[in-house]
Design a protein with these regions (language model features):
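Substrate-binding groove of N-acetylhexosamine-processing glycoside hydrolases
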Residues: 1-151
């Protein structure tokens, strides 16, 4: 079975129907997130650093993070049709979490550069945005019981 055909069959089985927007989203994901090997780690869960990678963390994103945003937007287009499907909701939240994690890595690099250049106003602004992003991610993850502590 060809990979394209396998994905179509898998998605129809997972969501209970075929959906063009969902298929576009997963096509993007398999060509970006799932096409890369390695140990990419979110700046949120990595050991604190101002660097993209060191002995403890590798936060250099191995794909274009804008593509994951596009995939999330495609998934969101299916909300009216698939919103009650638990697998769809799970995947929607997980891809959204990845979008936020990727953005956190970008912000982390900004405030790392702010620290190196001693730009206190920018460092304060970007580090605050990083902390707010953690709250946003926590709020998103809290919308599905599979991501709640104790479940």
């Amino acid at each position: 079975m060809e990979l394209d055909e396998w994905f179509e069959t898998y998605l129809e089985s997972r969501y209970g129907c075929r959906d063009e927007a969902v298929e576009k989203a997963w096509d993007i994901l398999r060509k970006t997130v799932y096409a890369n090997e390695g140990n990419y780690e979110s700046a949120i869960t990595a050991r604190p650093t101002f660097e993209k990678h060191n002995n403890w963390a590798y936060t250099d994103i191995p794909y274009d993070p804008v593509e994951v945003i596009k995939a999330w937007k495609y998934l969101l287009q299916a909300a009216d049709r698939l919103g009650k499907n638990p697998c769809y909701r799970y995947d929607l939240i997980l891809v959204g979490k990845q979008v936020l994690a990727n953005y956190a890595t970008i912000i982390q690099q900004k405030f790392g550069e702010d620290y190196r250049t001693k730009d206190l106003p920018a460092f304060t602004r970007n580090s605050r945005e990083f902390m707010e992003l953690i709250d946003d991610m926590d709020e998103l993850m809290g919308t599905h019981e599979a991501f709640l502590l104790g479940k």
